[in-house]
């Protein structure tokens, strides 16, 4: 029978519930269990697709085109699985589904209520995740903090699941904070006690408490928490700030967290073999080289907006025993006069995805700098589109060339709406989303990176290169090295007379893994190291 683990949070948000859930998933997978994982977000948006990155961080796209929470990126990178649309559920999705059923008459004229209709819909999403993946274990993270009004239906639903399928098949893990008061020189357990009290008042008794802390937790403190929270002392797990995220699974294993889980759920799988993971962490801690990459974006104040890009750069660096330092460059501040000052000390330049016109001209200036000064360049989504516009303006001399997204009246729409997007009015869920094939041309940097004729990558865009300009740009040295199999859509571009200048319409960062870097990122970091050594 499938086992269910629920991860909740208390005291404050951003405690690392997602990393805790992902780390436990990795440990259970290494015990030979088939693990899947999902995130429940209590906000009323259907998905984060139309939310500002300042509100929510990056939007992580799954193979099947779901726009999801950034925690799914952590899940995929840690557990090394590809998740699907069932892995992220929001209050908006739940209510939307229930209202559609009500309109269809599926409730037989009954009064639709939070209990049982909303809670039943939530439970069905939990069970469906296990059914769709044939999982041995389903880990579900509940977003937000215990005590939030928005979380109550989710907490009630997961409380009911224990009654539905039996206590041996359900486990609750609660993540809290033990603050350290520097002035008093003390750590305080009271916030955790109150958080657990709140959770218990809702009918949920946690089986494990994971305490986030910047200082070591003494045995006396663990005993105190165990007494007041009514759990075994061994089930108080310390989650101290780590030097690398990838060390967290090892820390949890040292404290026997996965064994406690298996004992409670009556799973007799052998201990997790973490030899390869330990070697990875040792490598990360002992990188001998450095390279600096300029990330030119418009959301640089909130680095979570580009979290998968940064992780993909790090993964690529691990292959070369290299610590990749990211220099955050606000695209709105970049001008032709100061670009040398802002990016001149870096070994490579990366322009990530985005929407809208803010910061676009600064990104184009940075791209021009990379092209003219032979600096390794990687463009992603909007970065690829702007690389095309920069070339059209400054090499072909098409003054005013632009994207019709940014300037609908441009005389040269190098980037234009996909044909199927012309009549679309809604913003949410209407982009070209998910995994699509890309055919590569031989003897190109893209082909050399992948070493395969056809690759599959995840997309999230509405605009595309305008094929009207392909012949003239090809004559001028612009290479269309990746296209859709029918040749209609441009997927990858690069430059002939440049050491390494590649840009992709898709989002390669979404499939990178710590032990298996994404090929374009791998070769971009390699080119950046070569550039550094040649200076």
Curated annotation (Swiss-Prot):
Mg(2+) binds at residues 71, 141. It is an enzyme of class 6 (ligase). Pathway: Pyrimidine metabolism; CTP biosynthesis via de novo pathway; CTP from UDP: step 2/2. The active site is at 381 (nucleophile), 507, 509. Allosterically activated by GTP, when glutamine is the substrate; GTP has no effect on the reaction when ammonia is the substrate. The allosteric effector GTP functions by stabilizing the protein conformation that binds the tetrahedral intermediate(s) formed during glutamine hydrolysis. Inhibited by the product CTP, via allosteric rather than competitive inhibition. GO terms for cellular component: cytosol. Residues 1-267 are annotated as: Amidoligase domain. Keywords: ATP-binding, Glutamine amidotransferase, Ligase, Magnesium, Metal-binding, Nucleotide-binding, Pyrimidine biosynthesis. GO terms for molecular function: ATP binding; CTP synthase activity; glutaminase activity; identical protein binding; metal ion binding. Its EC number is 6.3.4.2. One of its GO terms (biological process) is pyrimidine nucleobase biosynthetic process. SUPFAM superfamilies: Class I glutamine amidotransferase-like, P-loop containing nucleoside triphosphate hydrolases. It comes from the Bacteria. Residues 292-534 form the Glutamine amidotransferase type-1 domain. UTP binds at residues 13, 188-193, 224. Pfam families: CTP_synth_N, GATase. L-glutamine binds at residues 54, 354, 382-385, 405, 462. PROSITE patterns: GATASE_TYPE_1. CTP binds at residues 13, 148-150, 188-193, 224. Belongs to the CTP synthase family. Homotetramer. Catalyzes the ATP-dependent amination of UTP to CTP with either L-glutamine or ammonia as the source of nitrogen. Regulates intracellular CTP levels through interactions with the four ribonucleotide triphosphates. CTPSs have evolved a hybrid strategy for distinguishing between UTP and CTP. The overlapping regions of the product feedback inhibitory and substrate sites recognize a common feature in both compounds, the triphosphate moiety. To differentiate isosteric substrate and product pyrimidine rings, an additional pocket far from the expected kinase/ligase catalytic site, specifically recognizes the cytosine and ribose portions of the product inhibitor. This is CTP synthase. The lineage of its organism: Bacteria, Bacillati, Bacillota, Bacilli, Bacillales.
């Amino acid at each position: 029978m499938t086992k269910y683990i629920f991860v909740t949070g208390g005291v404050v948000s951003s405690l690392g519930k997602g990393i805790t859930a992902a780390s436990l998933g990795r440990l259970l997978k290494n015990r030979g269990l088939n693990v899947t994982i999902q995130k429940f977000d209590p906000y009323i948006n259907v998905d984060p697709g139309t939310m500002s990155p300042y509100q929510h961080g990056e939007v992580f796209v799954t193979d099947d085109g779901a726009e999801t929470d950034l925690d799914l990126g952590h899940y995929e990178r840690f557990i090394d699985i590809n998740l699907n649309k069932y892995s992220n559920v929001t209050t908006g999705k739940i209510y939307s589904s229930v209202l559609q059923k009500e309109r269809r008459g599926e409730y037989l004229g009954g009064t639709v209520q939070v209990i049982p209709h909303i809670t039943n819909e939530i439970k069905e999403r939990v069970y469906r995740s296990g059914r769709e993946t044939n999982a041995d274990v389903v880990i579900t993270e509940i977003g937000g903090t215990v005590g939030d009004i928005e979380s109550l239906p989710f907490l009630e639903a997961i409380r009911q699941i224990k009654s539905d399928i039996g206590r041996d098949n359900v486990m609750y893990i609660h993540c809290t904070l033990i603050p350290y008061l520097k002035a008093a020189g003390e750590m305080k357990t009271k916030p955790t006690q109150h958080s657990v009290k709140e959770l218990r008042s809702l009918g949920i008794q946690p089986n494990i408490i994971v305490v986030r802390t910047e200082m070591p937790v003494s045995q006396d403190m663990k005993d105190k928490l165990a007494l007041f929270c009514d759990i075994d002392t061994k089930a108080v797990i310390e989650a101290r700030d780590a030097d690398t995220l990838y060390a967290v699974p090892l820390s949890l294993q040292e404290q026997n967290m996965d064994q406690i889980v298996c004992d409670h759920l009556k799973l007799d799988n052998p201990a997790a073999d973490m030899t390869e993971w330990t070697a990875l962490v040792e490598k990360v801690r002992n990188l001998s080289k450095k390279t600096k990459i300029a990330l030119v974006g418009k959301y640089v104040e909130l680095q979570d907006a580009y979290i998968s890009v940064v992780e993909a750069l790090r993964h690529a660096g691990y292959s070369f025993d290299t610590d990749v330092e990211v220099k955050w460059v606000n695209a709105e501040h970049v001008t032709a006069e100061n670009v040398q000052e802002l990016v001149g000390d870096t070994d490579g330049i990366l322009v990530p995805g985005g929407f809208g016109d803010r910061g676009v001209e600064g990104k184009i200036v940075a791209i021009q700098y990379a092209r003219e000064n032979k600096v390794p360049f990687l463009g992603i989504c909007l970065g690829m589109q702007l690389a095309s516009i920069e070339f059209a303006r400054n090499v072909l001399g098409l003054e005013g060339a632009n994207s019709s997204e940014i300037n609908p009246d441009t005389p040269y729409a190098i980037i234009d709406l996909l044909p199927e997007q012309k009549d679309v009015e809604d913003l949410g869920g209407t982009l070209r989303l998910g995994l699509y094939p890309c055919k590569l041309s031989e003897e190109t940097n893209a082909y050399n990176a992948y070493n395969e004729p056809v690759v599959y990558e995840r997309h999230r865009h509405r605009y595309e290169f305008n094929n009207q300009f392909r012949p003239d740009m090809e004559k001028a040295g612009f290479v269309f090295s990746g296209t859709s199999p029918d040749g209609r859509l441009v997927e990858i571009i690069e430059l002939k007379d440049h050491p390494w200048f590649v840009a992709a319409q898709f989002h390669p960062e979404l499939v990178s893994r710590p032990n298996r870097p994404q090929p374009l990122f791998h070769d971009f970091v390699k080119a950046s190291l070569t550039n550094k050594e040649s200076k």
